[in-house]
């Protein structure tokens, strides 16, 4: 009996001037201002001397900007050393611990990191982020917010200084939200949590965003990459009530209404998901086609699980119409047809999906659209239609994506046997 995959329940796809590498020879006016030698009546205290030495030290290095990393954490002792190694190119590192009961704080201090502890009740991500941002010194030129389960690829500091301009307020960079066992990106998009200090604040209780307080000047730096290695043991149970609070506080915020509907889907609250995402689509500010199409796909998934397959088909067709340049709507429609044993429609739809070669760098992209699943569906559907040569052909391509997949390997043997002896 051939196994079938339920591709509809997917994990969250996450909540993206060429300068010389070295500054020119320093001139005299680049030196820091020294104390007035004429006035010896008031000597600088020890802290003032240290600040002056720090300022002079920075002026004599290759770095043009003061770069500070900041983060929040709780019970993440197993990530501390790896995270520190990836961010230590910064001038200073500040971490706000929100109530760890393990050795997180101890390990952070052993790395020389500035640590403060504060417990927030009730918990909100934006409040904690803003509190951690307060720890960053006011003379910081560039702030970088990361989490302890993330790792910068080496050399990010040099690339940041290469592309950051005096009037830049924010930088976008590559974020690998999910990676395979060989450290190859599965889900990749731009992240933009590198910023100036005084021009931003964090907003929203969960899926918090960095909100600009003035006009932005954003630079995209493709040569900076941040990898995400999540702790799958951590609970995300707080997300749903925080999202409900977020939408209650700002019911017209299309982004958070979309996130809330998606969260209902993850909790299998199908009717709430449908109602919430229909509301998202009705909002005047909900204009981003990728996200609108995602809401339509999630509505379709909910109808699928309610066994209302024609409504699911209708919403997937609407998703394709909304964003015909994305594979995702076609992929899920192909799966719907496959699950309903409409194999000719499955093949036609999967082939339409494969005509789309672009893979946008946004958080809204489904792994199954680019991981060989379409070839798997083509192979099984071809087999059901007794097109055994096509089944072999398509499954061979699926195996190129997943050579160690036992199900695909077993299916391939079945396809080969049927191709050789179609009447058996």
Question: What spans do the regions from the language model cover?
Answer:
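Short, well-formed alpha-helical segments that are part of the catalytic scaffolds
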Residues: 68-92
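Active-site nucleotide-sugar/metal-binding loop of Leloir-type enzymes
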Residues: 130-142
